[in-house]
Regions:
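A residue-level marker of the well-folded mature domains of exported/periplasmic proteins
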Residues: 26-345
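N-terminal leader/targeting signatures
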Residues: 4-7, 18, 337
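Bacterial N-terminal signal peptides
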Residues: 10-23
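Bacterial N-terminal signal peptides that target proteins for export
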Residues: 1-13
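N-terminal cationic leader/targeting segments used for protein routing and processing
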Residues: 3-4, 22, 40
Length: 345
């Protein structure tokens, strides 16, 4: 059952990550399945009731963003008394593997699926198949180009707004004038596409800022992003006054390229999503700003929404998990610290 979207009150979870072993660190094969169980009985269930089995399929598992999503999912699973099976593709560009994972969980007849689609078009069919098979789906992080009744809810950041905030942060750093480059992520990724479009709309409000390049895809890894950033620096050289990178691996790649050329801190630079290296760079003045999501909240609310859908409760059509901007000036505020360092909150 769905109801008209209402404004969502945001809150930041207080974490104690030492109590949970997330099990998706860089040394573990990303596609290896990880199961997590809540400790309590299912809410509203009688004695001996079957625990709900929820599959959660991210775009990948190695980046800190996904580990934070996983932690939030575990928090919700513990509170609701459900089991979460966490499994993602080895590469964030492997659509076929993600499709196979969805189909596999449908065949296993899990009670529900939370999915972050790698491709807004390619995952439509598998999601509809899940619905026909009686397995409800909640989409999280990145959108799906399907009718709204194809899935129970969409839990995500307002990525277009995030792109606009990135444009404002970069323009403020440049004093409203200069030449900028935007590096795109990967074709088919709806979340980053929205950030890119939001940025281009936002930066267009500054007539003295010129976009030198906004159509180049940096790819899904830090290495490919570093290579693309080097290409942009080779092509435009001293003309570049500012850069926007739309996700964690892209931003880390740009940071490495700037550091390699001793330009970090000299070229205005705004990233999206964080890591320890990015947070350190922000504090050191190598980054002008980082647009932040709340991945812990995203994981938490995705699990909460799918459980509501399974139990026939009202579910919001879109759940906005919030978007924030970290700067060197506010990096030590409680809210920003919890988003930058969820493992230390």
């Amino acid at each position: 059952v769905r109801k008209r979207v209402q404004p969502l009150s945001f809150f930041i979870l207080s974490l104690a990550i030492s109590v949970v072993s997330i099990g998706v660190g860089g040394c573990q094969p990303p596609a290896e399945e990880a199961s997590s169980a809540g400790k309590g009985a299912p809410a509203g269930a009688g004695d001996g009731a079957k625990r709900l089995q929820i599959a959660m399929i991210p775009k990948g598992t190695t980046h800190i963003f996904w580990r934070s999503v996983h932690f939030g999912a575990l928090k919700a699973a513990e509170e609701l008394g459900v089991d979460v099976q966490w499994r993602g593709p080895q590469k964030e560009s492997d659509r076929d593997e993600q499709i196979s994972l969805v189909q596999g969980f449908v065949n296993k007849q899990v009670d529900g699926i939370c999915l972050a689609p790698l491709d807004a078009d390619a995952l439509v069919g598998p999601v509809k198949e899940a619905g026909r098979g009686g397995v409800p789906v909640v989409i999280f992080d990145s959108g799906l180009k399907a009718e709204s009744d194809a899935f129970a809810s969409y839990v995500a950041t307002d990525n277009f707004r995030g792109g606009e905030l990135a444009a404002k942060a970069l323009a403020d750093k440049l004093g409203g004038k200069g030449n900028v480059v935007m590096l795109r992520y990967n074709q088919g990724s709806e979340s980053t596409h929205q950030r890119e479009e939001g940025f281009l709309k936002g930066i267009a409000a500054y007539p003295e800022i010129k976009v030198l390049s906004g159509d180049q895809y940096a790819g899904t890894t830090t290495e490919s992003s570093m290579d693309k950033a080097q290409q942009m620096l080779n092509r435009y050289g001293d003309e570049i006054d500012g850069i926007f990178a739309v996700c964690e691996p892209n931003a880390e790649g740009v940071l490495r390229a700037l550091e390699d050329r001793q330009l970090a801190g000299k070229v205005a630079f705004v990233g999206f999503d964080s890591s320890e290296a990015m947070a350190d760079a922000l504090r050191a003045g190598k980054l002008s700003a980082i647009v932040l999501q709340d991945p812990v909240q995203m994981g938490y609310l995705a699990i909460k929404s799918i459980v509501q859908a399974i139990r026939g409760e009202q579910v919001e059509g879109f759940v906005d998990t919030g978007v924030y901007v970290a700067t060197p000036e506010n990096i030590d505020s409680d809210q920003i610290k919890k988003l930058l360092f969820p493992d230390k909150a």
